[in-house]
Curated annotation (Swiss-Prot):
Signal peptide: none
Source domain of life: Bacteria
Family (UniProt): Belongs to the SfsA family.
Gene Ontology molecular function: DNA binding
Protein name: Sugar fermentation stimulation protein homolog
Length: 237
């Protein structure tokens, strides 16, 4: 299979427990129990199942306090990405490979983590530019919550996420604004805002669409070998 982002060799285990937001105890296949860094500090609603199979990466950096990082978990037969640093790595490669038809001809270069907003204290995940074209501001959101085949974001109240939506609205119409939802599991075919988890986010989401913010709910298949782009999910508003 041709992966957009191939993983290095990963280590299999079973989730024993997750605690203090940043930590997870995992029993490796050889019976050893190790403590891994959990990059996802959110509630991980529906994707933190004790006893589920997980995969870890291991760093050789002696300066790291924890050598292992929790990368993914298997929920009801589907691998779900846990590492919140993954989406931006994958989208960076996707932009380099120009795999998004609605963006392909609209940029020559792109830069990550560019300051923007009224106070320049926010950072857009990617800024795409091309002479004589509007700049494109792309915000990326890791999405793991699902109800059957419907992916939902957010999975908890997020004032930060609300702020990002408002900032995208504010840059219109002098630039293009894109909210890209990285659906970090391959079993979801549709996407909707998680109104039950953050009603205000849902309201702003619909306001953003009405104002001209472009929504890209991107489907990705994740497994221990790598990450593959599956196309766009259908937006349910």
């Amino acid at each position: 299979m041709d992966f957009l982002y191939p993983y290095p060799p990963l280590i299999s285990g079973i989730l024993v427990k997750r605690y203090k937001r940043f930590l997870a105890d995992v029993e490796l296949d050889n019976g050893e129990i190790v403590t891994a860094h959990c990059p996802n500090t959110g509630p991980m609603t529906g994707v933190c199942q004790v006893g589920a199979q997980v995969y870890l990466s291991k760093s050789d950096n002696p300066q790291r306090k924890l050598a292992y990082t929790w990368e993914m978990i298997q929920i009801d037969g589907t691998w779900v990405g846990v590492n919140t640093a993954l989406p931006n790595r994958v989208i960076k490669q996707a932009l380099a490979d120009r795999i998004f038809p609605n963006l392909t001809n609209s940029y020559d270069t792109f830069k990550p983590e560019v300051p923007y907003g009224k106070d320049k204290k926010s950072r857009i995940d990617f800024l795409l530019t091309k002479p004589e074209e509007k700049s494109i501001y792309v915000e990326v959101k890791n999405t793991t919550l699902s109800q059957e085949k419907l992916a939902l974001f957010p999975d908890t109240e997020t004032t930060r996420g609300q702020k990002h939506l408002q900032e995208l609205i504010d840059i219109l119409p002098t630039a293009r604004a894109v909210m890209l939802y990285f659906i970090n599991r391959g079993d979801c075919t549709h996407f909707s805002p998680g109104d039950a988890y953050d009603r205000r986010y849902g309201e702003l989401f619909r306001q953003a669409i009405a104002a001209g913010v472009e929504v890209m709910p991107c489907r990705f298949m994740v497994n221990p070998e790598g990450v593959k782009f599956l196309g766009m999910a259908e937006l349910v508003v």
